[in-house]
From Swiss-Prot:
Its main location: secreted. Contains a number of strongly recognized T-cell epitopes distributed throughout the protein sequence and induces high level of IFN-gamma, indicating this might be a good vaccine candidate. A fusion protein (p846) of 3 well-defined antigens (EspC, EsxH and Rv2660c) induces robust specific T-cell immune response and could be an effective vaccine. It is found in: Secreted. Transmembrane segments: none annotated. The gene is esxH. Keywords: Metal-binding, Secreted, Virulence, Zinc. InterPro entries: ESAT-6-like_sf, T7SS_ESAT-6-like. Forms a tight 1:1 complex with EsxG. When it is complexed to EsxG, interacts directly with host HGS/HRS. To improve expression in E.coli the proteins were cloned as a single protein in the order esxH-esxG with a cleavable thrombin tag. This is ESAT-6-like protein EsxH.
């Protein structure tokens, strides 16, 4: 049977990258919101009402996406830490 080796520092780095991507998405969302605000003032009547509904959906989707990236990052980090702790405990049993 072959031995499975994990690169825990790289895995934790990946979790950090994922958290950074969430920040990037949030920043891009803020930039897009500025552009959308300019459009909002130009749309009146039925078009404005339709725009408001679309904007609410967009805002919710952006929040959900950022929240999902944060959740994936923290889950990946927690699982990596748990695996590393388990590996350390098992290695200690064998004098490693």
């Amino acid at each position: 049977m072959s031995q499975i080796m994990y690169n825990y520092p790289a895995m934790l780095g990946h979790a950090g990258d994922m958290a950074g991507y969430a920040g990037t998405l949030q920043s891009l969302g803020a930039e897009i919101a500025v552009e959308q605000a300019a459009l909002q003032s130009a749309w009146q009547g039925d078009t404005g009402i339709t725009y408001q509904a679309w904007q609410a959906q967009w805002n919710q989707a952006m929040e959900d996406l950022v929240r999902a990236y944060h959740a994936m990052s923290s889950t990946h980090e927690a699982n990596t830490m748990a695996m590393m702790a388990r590996d350390t405990a098992e290695a200690a049993k064998w004098g490693g």
